[in-house]
Curated annotation (Swiss-Prot):
The gene is yvdC. This is Uncharacterized protein YvdC. It comes from Bacillus subtilis (strain 168). InterPro entries: MazG-like_dom, MazG-related_YvdC, YpjD/YvdC. Pfam families: MazG.
Amino acid sequence: MQLADAEKWMKEFYEKRGWTEYGPFIRVGFLMEEAGELARAVRAYEIGRDRPDEKESSRAEQKQELIEEMGDVIGNIAILADMYGVSLEDVMKAHQEKLTKRFEHA
């Protein structure tokens, strides 16, 4: 899936459910929640959870969980960017330019 297609799909999906009605401060809160879930998935994949109250998952299930949580983070970033009239392509271009400039003499 191309980045622009993914953005379009996410925006339509979120709008259909009324999820775009939340303002930027609430959206950032959701982003932080998803970042925490991604951190949990990374931990499970890298060092395990060591929780007797949780079912141990296979490596494939852990990787799928990583992918899904990354998608949740990207989805929230895409919706937040859209609130400010910015595309993910704009975000990535600015990020690339910032890092290139910052480290051009390193």
